[in-house]
Amino acid sequence: MTLPTQRTGVIAKKLGMTRFFDEAGQHVPVTVLSLDGCQVTGVRTVEKDGYTALQLGAGAKKAKNTSNAMRGHFAKAAVEPKRVVAEFRVEENALIEVGAELTADHFVAGQKVDIQGVTVGKGFAGAMKRWNFGGLRATHGVSVSHRSHGSTGNRQDPGRTFPGKKMAGHLGQETVTTLNVTVWKVDVERGLILVKGAVPGHEGSYVKVRDAVKKALPADAPRPGAFRKAGEAAPAAAETPAEEAPAAETEEGEG
């Protein structure tokens, strides 16, 4: 049995959510992800680095806000400074040249993907909101502590609260991976990937999208990936010519 080639993922920008209607007329909530100049900025090889991976960068960043080290790194790759940089482990036969730009047709409709992002931070939250605790009773001796989490330990032995006890604390703003998200549609001209359901992170945040590790890769998925080589211009959007209006017919007898 030959395992499928482990391809690179992409760095996408979360634009927001909308909905579409399927053939049965049911509305499908989707999240719109944009490929904001996702380019290969580095290649890791076994001979040089001990492992095989691709370093990708996405988003525009001003040169004055980029460190000298990263500015030189991007200049060596002949790409503009990137806002976000991330690595994706790939197989040796899935390496892509530096400077290539990943396109939306890297994924196909119906494919399962895993999406990793940083959840929306909600600040300090109580146990009921953070851990879905039921709280204390509304009456019968309970005063002020209706939303408290209750006991935090045992007795004199062990005489302490165990690490990891679910208590009030900071909620959100943590790295989360959503598995087996379905790709609803891809728009190559606009560089958009539409996936069913919600994606971790707020609007404008960057997420990492890769092939699902627990599902088989579709046979029509491009290998090693869909990309434009360095210096290759993006295809222009097809323009539909305007239809000419039919000329008005003049009836006989009219001047």
UniProtKB/Swiss-Prot annotation:
Positions bearing N5-methylglutamine: Q156
PTM text: Methylated by PrmB.
InterPro entries: Ribosomal_uL3, Ribosomal_uL3_bac/org-type, Ribosomal_uL3_CS, Transl_B-barrel_sf
HAMAP family in the record: Ribosomal_uL3_B
Record's subunit section: Part of the 50S ribosomal subunit. Forms a cluster with proteins L14 and L19.
PANTHER family, alphabetized: 50S RIBOSOMAL PROTEIN L3, LARGE RIBOSOMAL SUBUNIT PROTEIN UL3C
Protein name, entry field: Large ribosomal subunit protein uL3
Lineage: Bacteria, Pseudomonadati, Pseudomonadota, Alphaproteobacteria, Caulobacterales
Gene (UniProt): rplC
